[in-house]
């Protein structure tokens, strides 16, 4: 171990901590070391560790966050070499609630709580839960659906080693969890010190160039194809409007997906996306056979160490202004829109119902209502609903209750999802599902809605978007809205292709 690397806590402190713990089931002891960033960014650190050009690489992820409303999430996270990957769904021969598997797996880990200086994620499960998993949470929504993308319904990496980048102190924190069910504390400490030292060596190695992904020549001007087309989507809108007028639902959220061939490496799509569409939830998840690339604006649900559950309904959108005055005027216009306010309040009520199902009703609160949140290109109406879990409920129960968001399904939620399944006839996959993490601490989680998210598989980027349909929605306008939502990501691909064509040439 190099002299400049200090592992914390030291072994004597860790032994003392182990002796002080009354709970004999505690078996995870996190240790860590700091590394000044030295101008090393999280995405370059990820490239050094993930080795994307290596065909024998393991799954990995990069989670980042961009500043919104002058608030910056403190940490970015990198994960490599998971101890185990949970994959479920028909493609894996496991058609069951993935949260049951995850909860059982994570029940075998119990982290020592009094290790100071750790970020909100210091080890745990990271990945996605697809929209289609709702059939396990709400069996009434189950329908026979065509599986176009052939992806796992859930994909979760269990990572004992996490590299966190602290945006405040501009330093990396390399964390490894010692599992005393698998080794003694002393042996585990030495192994952890070696793992941390090896990671530091890779991050500080300037003897070789940064291993950017290999990028072949770019084929320009490729086109996309929708799975339903203009006529098909407008028919979806018309059908849902009939159900709304009959009183079956108040709102429904149909979607369409486009397939766009591209010769870009998926990480080069992500690099451009994080620049042109900075968002609270930026992620690149390498599942080896496919990749998930996203810039989501919207929290689905999170929980903290005090069992407080939070969800953020977002509904109502207006563009950013060219000047501060125009920006504020547009925000006032959005606040004053009766249609946007009515739809938003409906989703807040839905969120309150979801929270009430698993939280003490006396703790359920609308913490923020109809506030404006500003993003890079748009402004949204945002609210916050929270509550404290009842003693018999867990974070997994909270996730099931809130999933999927009303903004991607409708209201009443179950009936809307039944109608959506019958109309779309295909699995949605990652779109409208959740991307995020579940900590080993047994309490915390943080999951965003998989919006503005792309799936890259076999040289094709899949983009998907939907829109909320109410009784007076216009079919053509709704079709255009979904296309506009997808075009933000499509433009990212086009711009990245043009940039890389200048560097590596065109095919």
UniProtKB/Swiss-Prot annotation:
Involved pathway(s): Amino-acid biosynthesis; L-tryptophan biosynthesis; L-tryptophan from chorismate: step 1/5
Reaction catalysed by this enzyme: chorismate + L-glutamine = anthranilate + pyruvate + L-glutamate + H(+)
This protein's GO CC annotations: anthranilate synthase complex; cytoplasm
InterPro entries for the chain: ADC_synthase, Anth_synth_I-like, Anth_synth_I_N, Anth_synth_I_PabB, Chorismate_C
Annotated positions binding Mg(2+): 343, 481
Other known facts: Component I catalyzes the formation of anthranilate using ammonia rather than glutamine, whereas component II provides glutamine amidotransferase activity.
Name of the protein in its database record: Anthranilate synthase component 1
Gene that specifies this protein: TRP2
């Amino acid at each position: 171990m190099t002299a400049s690397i200090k592992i914390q806590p030291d072994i004597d402190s860790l032994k003392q901590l182990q002796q002080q713990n009354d709970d004999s089931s505690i078996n995870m002891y996190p240790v860590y070391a700091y590394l000044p960033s030295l101008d090393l960014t999280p995405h370059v650190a990820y490239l050094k560790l993930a080795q994307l050009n290596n065909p024998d690489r393991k799954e990995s992820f990069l989670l980042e966050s961009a500043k919104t409303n002058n608030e910056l999430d403190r940490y970015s996270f990198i994960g490599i070499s998971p101890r185990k990957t949970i994959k479920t769904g028909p493609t894996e021969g496991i058609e069951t609630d993935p949260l049951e598997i995850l909860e059982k797996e994570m029940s075998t880990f119990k982290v020592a709580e009094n290790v100071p200086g750790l970020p909100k994620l210091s080890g745990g499960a990271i990945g996605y839960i697809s929209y289609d998993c709702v059939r396990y949470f709400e069996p009434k929504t189950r329908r026979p659906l065509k599986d176009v993308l052939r992806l796992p319904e859930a994909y979760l990496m269990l990572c004992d080693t996490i590299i966190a980048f602290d945006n405040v102190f501009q330093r990396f924190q390399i964390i490894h969890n010692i599992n005393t069910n698998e080794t003694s504390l002393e042996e585990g400490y030495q192994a952890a010190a070696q793992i941390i030292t090896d990671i530091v060596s890779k991050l500080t190695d300037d003897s070789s160039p940064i291993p950017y992904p290999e990028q072949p020549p770019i084929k320009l001007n490729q086109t996309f194809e929708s799975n339903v087309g203009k006529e098909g989507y407008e028919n979806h809108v018309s059908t849902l409007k009939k159900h709304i007028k009959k009183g079956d639902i108040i709102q429904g959220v149909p979607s369409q997906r486009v397939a766009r061939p591209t010769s870009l490496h998926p990480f080069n799509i992500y690099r451009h996306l994080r620049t042109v569409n900075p968002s609270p939830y930026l992620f690149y998840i390498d599942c080896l056979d496919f990749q998930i690339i996203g810039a989501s604006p919207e929290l689905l649900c999170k929980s903290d160490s005090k069992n407080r559950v939070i969800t953020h309904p977002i509904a109502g959108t207006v563009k950013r202004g060219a000047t501060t005055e125009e920006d504020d005027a547009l925000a006032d216009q959005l606040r004053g829109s009766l249609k946007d306010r009515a739809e938003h309040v409906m989703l807040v009520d839905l969120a309150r119902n979801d929270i009430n199902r698993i939280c003490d009703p006396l703790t359920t609160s609308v913490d923020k209502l109809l506030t404006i949140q500003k993003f890079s290109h748009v402004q949204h109406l945002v609210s916050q609903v929270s509550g404290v879990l009842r003693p018999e409920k867990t974070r997994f129960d909270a996730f099931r209750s809130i999933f999927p968001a009303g903004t991607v399904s409708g209201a009443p939620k179950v009936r809307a999802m039944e109608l959506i399944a019958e109309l779309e006839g295909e699995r949605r996959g990652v779109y409208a599902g959740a991307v995020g993490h579940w900590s080993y601490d047994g309490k915390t989680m943080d999951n965003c809605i998989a919006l503005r998210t792309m799936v890259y598989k076999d040289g094709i980027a899949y983009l998907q978007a939907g829109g909320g349909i109410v009784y007076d929605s216009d079919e053509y306008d709704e079709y255009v809205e979904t296309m506009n939502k997808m075009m933000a990501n499509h433009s990212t691909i086009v711009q990245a292709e043009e940039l890389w064509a200048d560097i590596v040439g065109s095919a």
